[in-house]
Amino acid sequence: MPGRHITDNVVVAFETMHTIGKRKKGKEGLMAIKLDMSKAYGQVELGYLEVVIRKLGLCERWISLVMMCVTTVSYEVLINGEPRGKITPSKGLRQGDPISSYLFLLCAEGLSALIKKKEAVGLIRGVGVSKFAPPVSHLFFVDDSIIFCRATMEECKQVAEVLDTYGKELGQKINRDKTSLFFSKNTRTDIQNGVKDLKGNVGTFRNSGVYDPSKINSNLKDN
């Protein structure tokens, strides 16, 4: 897209994480939740996908072509080297298919809408990198998601409610063992423990792929 760069989200994620990392004072802490979905592509409900792309107002011809592509998939099983019938999946996108990543991002618009709805009434507040900067509440990297909010039990419960609703609609389940949390230094220990019980393991994103600062700098130089 004109005026957009492939590393824009990465830079925003890095700057927001830096803001959280240097926060040492204040009554409320800041936090980030790096989500890991179990079998993200394989659990997509095709009915949900159709509802989302219709809500986005895409043309009927395009919707029909896409749904035909994802609903006519079948697999053959070889037993002792011989094909033994076909298996027709009831859900899921084929990982590696050129269009699958784009369709998954369209599905993620549902999660974005749920978060924005909570933001609109002040139940979830994002993290701003400066006093006058707009708050950032979430960023998506295809099937990778990161949510920013205040480190309070109230906001964490709102995030958990959003993820539960999204998971039921899309068929996704959060992998608690691989979901990571990052807190600012002024977050109370009891809050960290309470949030950990809801979400997963406390950790940093230093070694989590696109959030690695060295990789961000490398990507910027390469581009």
Show which residues each predicted segment covers.
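Nucleotidyl polymerases of mobile genetic elements and RNA viruses
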Residues: M1-N223
